[in-house]
């Protein structure tokens, strides 16, 4: 067994912080989102997520595609296309969703630099521009992309 992280009543003694918490349901949704982001980028690690002692996820070590399918659902397998490209500056790998499965939601936008999840309007816009002329303007691209580059060349 490796590392175990348990969270219980984390703001029990700090009422000032507790008032910023949303409902248990919303806070658990945030926790699931973080779990998904982390588990997608580390397919070589086993992850288990339990809520009230009920298993939510039990992820074994797997290849990248299998992990994506385990985390995002079996139906995702037919919706994604693997990509890989390497230049002198960056290596890009991951999956993009087929155009017929795109929608107006940004729920399936996962972008990692050196295995670290990031939110970047600039990079998301660049990715969206690659879909110009292929889908309607309101349609958002869906992807799970891993960019690897020299850490000395970027500041995240």
Question: Where are each of the predicted segments found?
Answer:
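N-terminal phosphate-binding caps/lids of nucleotide- and nucleic-acid-binding domains
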Residues: 1-155
């Amino acid at each position: 067994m490796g590392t175990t992280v348990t969270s219980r009543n984390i703001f029990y003694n700090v009422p000032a912080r507790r008032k910023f918490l949303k409902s248990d349901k919303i806070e658990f949704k945030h926790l699931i989102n973080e779990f998904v982001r982390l588990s997608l980028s580390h397919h070589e690690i086993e992850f288990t997520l339990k809520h009230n002692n009920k298993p939510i996820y039990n992820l074994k070590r797997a290849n990248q595609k299998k992990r994506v399918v385990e985390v995002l659902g079996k139906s995702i397998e037919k919706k994604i296309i693997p990509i890989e490209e390497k230049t002198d500056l960056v290596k890009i790998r991951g999956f993009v969703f087929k155009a017929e499965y795109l929608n107006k939601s940004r729920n399936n936008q996962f972008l990692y630099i050196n295995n670290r999840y990031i939110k970047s309007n600039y990079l998301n816009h660049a990715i969206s521009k690659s879909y110009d002329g292929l889908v309607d303007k309101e349609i958002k691209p869906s992807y799970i992309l891993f960019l690897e580059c020299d850490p000395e060349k970027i500041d995240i």
